[in-house]
Amino acid sequence: DIIKSLYEKGKYGKDVEVICNGFKTDDYLAKISDLINSGFQNIIPILDNYRELDKLTESIDSTFNIGIRIASEEEPKFEFYTSRLGIGYKDIIPYYSQKIAEHPNARLKMLHFFINTGIKDTAYYWNELYKCLRVYARLKKIAPEVDSLNIGGGFPIKTSLNFDYDYQYMVNEIVSQIKKFCEEEGVEEPNIYTEFGSFTVGESGGHLYKIISQKRQNDREKWNMIDSSFMTTLPDTWAISRHFIMLPLNRWEDTYERVFLGGLTCDSDDYYNSEQHTNAIYLPVFSDTKPLYIGFFHTGAY
């Protein structure tokens, strides 16, 4: 609906490139088919499972492009071994040979590679990238029309003032590894697409709060109460222990004290503290007569 609406407003033509990710309901598949049947030829639905191609075949009456999402292996610390999304590494080549190679209309154009932990300079990440490249090289040799690799998972965003991540190094290293692997395999390098959701929009948002009271529960713990709830306005802080840049907005020259931050709800999890995160929280000393405001930054992703 958004694609159609923007087209009708003249924002782009029917040559716009659209990648359709995720598990697709019948309604989602029907709307993808409608776009392709109405002349949008650069729509690429990324197959999450075998059923999706069958449904698209039933409803599209012309040639169309598709991609396949690789079901990557998760980090050892995860509660499951393989991503719930996509098709397994070992199943992609047989699936292509049996269902796509002789398909009258579908053309495989893209492999989608997504790592939940994001792009990190770790053995786990490089190992998963190499497995993806092996699939790409094998596919390219039997399916020349495959020409694109969509890298998901994305770059991290700055979550603390001492954040240190060498973006340029990682970009250069990823491109270098892809180029080197393709040269060794004797296949053409793919067009590289990226999906960096948090990195793209993370810095677009911030949350501002007022400290409305301080509670001393014992000799060591001081609770600064905000005029809102972390559970409702910043749910990532308690749900997945997300850390954000947090700074006082005023009284920077005052004396500081170590505190815990609590939300207004009666839920015991409605807090943001130094035990849960990497840095202790220090704020200007609470005063009933001097208002204190704080801000959480780079919260625009979710």
Where are these regions (language model features)?
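Conserved, mostly hydrophobic/aromatic
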Residues: D1, I68, L111, I151, ...
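Active-site-proximal beta-alpha core segment in soluble small-molecule metabolic enzymes
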Residues: D1-S148
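Glycine-rich nucleotide phosphate-binding loop and flanking beta-alpha elements
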Residues: D26, L53, E74, I157, ...
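Anionic group-transfer/hydrolysis microenvironments
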Residues: Y50, A71-E73, F114, G152, ...
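Short glycine/threonine-rich loop-to-helix capping motif typified by GTGT followed
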Residues: K120-N127, K158-M170, V201-S213
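A compositional/structural signature marking long, glycine- and acidic/polar-rich segments
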Residues: L133-K141, S148-G154, N162-S176, N191
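Charged (often Lys/Glu-rich) extended helix/loop segments that serve as interaction or gating elements
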Residues: E173-V175, K179-E183, V187-Y302
